[in-house]
Amino acid sequence: MRFAAATALLGVAGLAGTAPAQTPPAAPAITRTVVAGTKLPSLGDTPLYFRVVSVSISPGQKISLSAPNGILYQLSGSTEVSAGEAKTITGGGGALIAGGTTASLTAGNGEHSALLYFLLAPKEALDQPVAAAPETVKELYRTTAPLPELKPGSYELNLTRVTFPPGMPSNPPHHRSGAALYYIVSGIGANTVDGKTADRGPGSLIYEPFGLVHQWGNPGSEPLTFLAFNINPEGVPAVVPETPAKP
């Protein structure tokens, strides 16, 4: 009997030893949401710049915006946007304002409305007022030189919200096929350029011209969320995972 019991125990131990190991849970994925975008049939030869302004609208106030191609992003509150057709955007939402269009914006729900307005503009439009009530607009950033390597042709312009999970290592070195302007919404990102890493926190604006090889990671314990205002040649990936060829 003792021999049989020992044999049974050995059998159980053997089964336990051959049980398959549990598969570790998959790491949280990066999420990307296109807030708004459009296709630009032709850029022509006109040099173009990035510009971003903040827009503040008091409860019940109505303002008019008129500028080159741009995308609105709602930070807080809500806004009724009328630009050909009417729509209401709330926190995290956005709207495309096509070049040459005058848009009417009204703060909704009796609340203060705070937005960002990302612009792709020729030099002659950089200093033109964006709103009929200029006190509602504050410039946050503009590129000092035209976006490089934008050749005549068709391009895609969009604003994308990206979230990196906590503890995400830096991604492989890459560069833009066109250009991008980042805005950190929340969290702190690690931005590496030329082997040097800098922390980028909420409200930071980071310009990525064509050919700038860089990396992004999130070493923190909270998600990192940022906006990418991006332009790239139609049919070409916005991000190229390689070092650009030298001219």
Predicted regions and their residues:
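Short, conserved secondary-structure segments in the cores of folded domains
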Residues: 53, 70, 85-86, 160, ...
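Bacterial N-terminal signal peptides
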Residues: 4-14
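Short beta-strand His + acidic residue motifs that chelate non-heme Fe in jelly-roll/DSBH
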Residues: 63-65, 81-82, 102-110, 172, ...
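Glycine- and acidic-residue-biased ligand/ion/polar-headgroup-sensing regions
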Residues: 67-85, 177-194
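Short acidic-glycine-tyrosine-enriched beta hairpin
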Residues: 84-102, 194-212
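A short beta-loop-beta micro-motif enriched in histidine and acidic residues
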Residues: 47-48, 58-73, 154-155, 167-183
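Residue-level "contact hotspot" at macromolecular interaction interfaces
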Residues: 56, 73, 88-89, 96, ...
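A short, N-terminal "cap"/entry segment at the start of jelly-roll beta-barrel domains
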Residues: 20-54, 62, 87-99, 104, ...
